[in-house]
Amino acid sequence: MIEVSNISKSYGKKQVLKNVSLDARAGERIVIVGRNGCGKTTLLKILAGAMAPDGGSLNYFGEEPLKDKTVFRRSCGYVPQENPLMDELSVLDNMRLWGYDRRNPDRALLEQFELEKLLKTKVSKLSGGMKRRVSLACGVISHPGFLIMDEPTAALDICYRDELLQWLKKYQGNSGIVLMTTHEEAEIMEADKCYVMRAGILFKIDDGQRNMKTILDYTKES
């Protein structure tokens, strides 16, 4: 189980996260929706250990990553919105870096993301969509129990987008927890839980209220 309690964060005098809380159980997929600049990416960076919060607590599978930073590495996979890859390195070398060792990634992972023939290719030679695939593969290379994804289907063609969503269902079927941001209606409606971020405050949308009109109303500044 994942428990996020009262996470806060400020940049200077601007508070961008205001006592954000959520929880997730094994096999759940959670989506967070909101306007650009509302705090979604900041929250995901904190949950992935890429940024420290000003306050609050995290509990991942009974461990506290804010007290023991190695928990982030053991428990989390992170796919940021921006390209996290090192362009001057090959696909294989990037995957080895993300896997924290020099072993080759397993074949099933390479087949899933269709990277078998690209391992020696420099990332700088790849298209935006292919870079996204490599980023996704890097995010799951350590087989994390908690997968954090910032708009994971951005830059993917419609066919591969569907393949990724089918893969996520299998991941959830193995008790994996997915937390992702999205602007896509289908992804919002398919999730187990939906939250809206507005000006640093996180609102949970009840299943009976989950429709695009309600979600759009929540995103509007009061």
Predicted regions: what they are:
Residues 48:
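Helix-to-loop junction immediately C-terminal to a conserved catalytic motif
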Residues 56-67, 71-72:
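Conserved ABC transporter NBD signature motif
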Residues 103-119:
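Conserved ABC ATPase "signature" region
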Residues 122-129:
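Conserved ABC ATPase signature
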Residues 136:
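Hydrophobic anchor residue at the start of the ABC signature
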Residues 147-151:
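Catalytic Walker B motif of ABC-type/P-loop ATPase nucleotide-binding domains
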